Amino acid sequence: MQTKTLFSRHYLEHHLPDHPQWDEDPRPAFDAVRELWQKARRHGDTWNEAQTEQEFIQPVLDLLGWSYVVQPEAHRGGRVTRPDYALFPDDETRDAAYPHQGDDEAFYSRARAIGEAKYWGRPLSQKHASGRETWKPGNPSHQMVSYLVGTRVAWGILTNGLIWRLYSREVSSTASEFYEVDLGLIFDFLPQGGAPTAAQLDQFRRWWLFFRRASFAPDPQGKSFVQRVHEGSATYAREISDKLKELVYEEVMPEIAGGFVAYRYHELGV
């Protein structure tokens, strides 16, 4: 699991289990994805993008409960301007969106998220040798920024099959702030034909909970699971920052000041 500031790592480790969704059983989904994974590991390196989608990504989206529309590519100035997938909460909402294809505002306003797929294992962030990302159309992270801005959808999922990233349109640095899970770190270390350990199932749960359709559905208060985790994480980070400031002013600064006074008295005689 990796997070680049979209969610606080400490919050995920210590407070995510406090959410009621944590108690849901991920094992049926785990077993289904594991079967798909075994095939992908045998053949994925030979797949192109369309094959990766057909053989792995679309079956996984189905298991996650999504209804979706695969978008025909739309080009403007040599750039692709639409994401691969519009992700809907159910078939009824998806079917209601079909007549609005071509009217992006009406179409995407019905979507809960957008999805962008790449061929198996394709790097999701292209970088200079210096390690800094470059802004160009071929960079998947920056494509996701463009799609989120263009469609005005709140959430985006980017994946190459192996790695899954969740992006939010509401953060300040959309391209570099994401929640990432590497499925290889879960499924490549399972005992051959055996049951997963509790720790491995927990790691899978941290993927399943953030990418399934149900986690983007509003609760009776109008907020989804991913919204609540994002808000809880931000609140937690602010509280930690405030506590650190209090510690500096109440404990650290007096000690520094006391040390300075003692130095002047003993060393300078003032």
Where are these regions (language model features)?
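Short, basic/polar, glycine-containing "phosphate-handling" surface segments that engage DNA
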Residues: M1-A40, A96-A113, A117-V270
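A short catalytic or substrate-binding loop motif that flags glycine-/basic-rich loops and adjacent residues
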Residues: R76-T81, L158
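Generic alpha-helical scaffold signal
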Residues: T46-Q54, R79, S109, T134, ...
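Acidic-basic catalytic patches of nuclease active cores, encompassing PD-(D/E)XK
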Residues: R41-G78
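Charged, often glycine-rich, active-site loop that binds/positions anionic groups
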Residues: R79-E92
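Gly/Pro-rich turn-and-neighbor structural signature
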Residues: V69-A74, E92-H100
